[in-house]
Amino acid sequence: MKEANSNIAPYRIQQGMVALELGATDNKILEFFDYLTGQVPTGCVYFLHVLPEFDVLSGILGREGEQVISNYEINDEVVARMEREIRSRMNHRDGMHVQFDVKEGNPLEQLLEDAKDVRADLIVIGQKSGVNKHGILAKNLARKAKANTLIIPDKATAGIRRMIVPIDFSKNSVKALRTAISLNESLEEPAEIVVLNIYEMPNLSVYKIQRTREQFEKMLQRDHEEAMDAFLNTQVPGYRDTLTTQLVMQKTPGIAQYIMDYATEEGGDLIVMGAKGHSKVELLLLGSVTEKVLAMNEHIPTLVVK
C-alpha cells in the first residue's frame, strides 16, 4: 500500500456486512470481496443469509410446506456449510474477524436491521442479470441503508484498474469522489480515476443569442471545463493532477445510459456514485440517475456512497 496523501486517508473497512443467497451469484460477490479485502485493511466482516419467512411459505405451499421448510431449516449445519463455502473461496486475512449467520425473515428488513446492529460501514450485495424485477433488493437496500453499499453484478470481474465517478458538482458528488480517492490510496497499484460529468445542451430556441450552435457548444464546453477545474481544486485540493476528467454533452434523454455507455466503452471496473442523505424525505429516493444505473448495470460493480 502506498503512502497516504495527508488530505484523504486510505480507505478502511471497519465493519463490513456481506449479504449472500447461498447460490450462484455468491461466486462473484466472494471473488470481488476477496480482492477488495486483499487491498483494503478490513477489521470485521459479517456474512448473512436471510431465509424467507416460514409461515408465509406454509400458507402458500399448504401440505407440502413442511417438507420445503425442513429443507431450509435454520441450524448449525447450514451455517457450517456457509462458512466452508466462504472460506474455500476467500483467502485468510490476518487481523480480519469473520462471523457467519443465517436468519429467517423479510430479506430487506433483516439486512437493514442487522446492518444497523453491527454498525456496518460497508454493505455488499449481489445482483442477478437478465431477470424480471432486475436488482430490486439491491436497489432498495442501497436506497434505505445508511452505510455505503457495494452492488456486485453476477457478470462482474475482480479488480480495479479504472474507476468511473459521475459528478454533478453536488455535495453527494464530493463524497463519492473523496471515497474513490480514499479507495485508490489503499490499492497496491493505483487505478485511474475518471471524473465524469454529463451536461445538457440547452434549448437554444428560448435564448436570444448571437452565436451559431457550434459556437454555443464550444462556449458551453469551456464553461464546464472551468467548472470542473474549480470543483476539483476546491473539493480535492492536491489531487487534480491525479484525476482524469471527461465531459460529455447529453444529446438525448437518459443520463444513466450515458454513464453506463461510457463506463462500458472505456473499460470501467468500478462505478462510484453519490446518493441522497438520510432525512425521511431523502430516503424515499436514492437518486433517479443512481437508481437507473443500478437497474441497467449487469457487469460493473457500483459503490453507492452515503
Language model features by range: what are they?
Residues 1-7, 12, 39, 110-159, ...:
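Gly/Ser-rich helix-loop-strand patches that form or flank binding pockets
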Residues 1-11, 35-37, 52, 69, ...:
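Structural beta-alpha unit
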Residues 2-68, 162-217, 221, 233-241, ...:
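Small/aliphatic-rich secondary-structure junction motif
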Residues 29, 107-108, 134, 176, ...:
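Amphipathic coiled-coil/heptad-repeat helices and related helical stalk/stem segments
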Residues 34-44, 131-133, 155-157, 182-192, ...:
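Short, charged helix-to-loop "capping" segments that act as catalytic/coupling loops
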Residues 47, 99-102, 151, 195, ...:
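A structural preference for short, hydrophobic beta-strand core positions in alpha/beta folds
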Residues 72-87, 221-233:
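Short, surface-exposed alpha-helical segments at coil->helix boundaries
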